[in-house]
Amino acid sequence: MLKSKQNKINAFVRNASIPRISKESILGLKVSLPSVEVQKRIVKILDSFTELTAELTAELTARKKQYEFYRDSLLRPKEGIPMVELKDIATDIYRGFGIKRDQVTANGIPCVRYGEIYTTYNTWFDTCVSHTCLENVANPKYFEHGDILFAITGESVEDIAKSVAYVGHEKCLAGGDIVVLKHKQNPRYLAHVLATQQAREQKSKGKVKSKVVHSNVPSIEKIRIPLPPLDVQKRYADALDNFDAICSDLNIGLPAEIEARQKQYEYYRDLLLTFAETGSTLACKLQAASCKLQA
């Protein structure tokens, strides 16, 4: 009931260093109160929506964990495969240079800002979503095909130094708080192996929880990974790309279904909880809602 009044409740908030609502405002809030029998029927319908949304969310989480388990099992350290530090395979490693949010343009030189590594790109990518003008960057730092990008600033210890591989063919600018790793290995393999739990634990080692978490080039260089021959790297990368594509195809419908069910829940919640009609009229509305849910 109170969820349907969220906008009205928000209007009661007093602007202060700590936003608050007075007791009088809450006690003065008017709500529709149908009979207990009707209340039970409303709750039953709305609970059905929330239960279905929870089931869909759990399925989406399970598929993600399934992929991560398969990836981590395939790329775990094995006898006969050497473990190397990233500094041993780096032909160059350097930091990008700051590109501010207001310096991003619709056209210009392709670029990546560190936050996009967390929010926009997955394991690897071939096209930049952002551009900037060269005159905006005092000390331009570029990345090219095959380079690995690390975001060395983040909001959580668990996700710090998330990395992605660039497999496009344009020369692009790396923003600040990004480390660029150049190498002669398979970039897709490196991207997959650097996303494993074993690699993430190394990335977060020694980091302290705070509002902003930082990493650096020396920490990146010390990360150890299994490094098979190039032909094996390609086989692993192809297998993981294929499995990831299958999981992604299966998952495309789930987020959309979850969003649709959430909107459906909100619609019927607001509809059912704002009626000022008689119980018999409301019963007809409830019956329609039940039929819609079953459909």
What are these regions (language model features)?
Residues 65, 285-295:
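Short, basic, low-complexity termini and linkers enriched in Ser/Thr/Gly/Pro
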Residues 35, 73-82, 271, 280, ...:
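Structural preference for solvent-exposed beta-strand-turn elements
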Residues 15, 98-99, 136-137, 167, ...:
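Short, solvent-exposed loop/turn positions at domain surfaces
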Residues 2, 14-34, 171-177, 208-229:
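A short glycine-rich beta-alpha junction/loop motif
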Residues 1-3, 113, 139-197:
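A short beta-sheet element
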Residues 73-96, 253, 257-263, 268:
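Non-catalytic DNA-recognition/assembly elements of restriction-modification systems
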Residues 25-64, 68, 221-262, 266:
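Amphipathic alpha-helical segments
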Residues 88-101, 116-145:
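Sequence-specific dsDNA recognition surfaces
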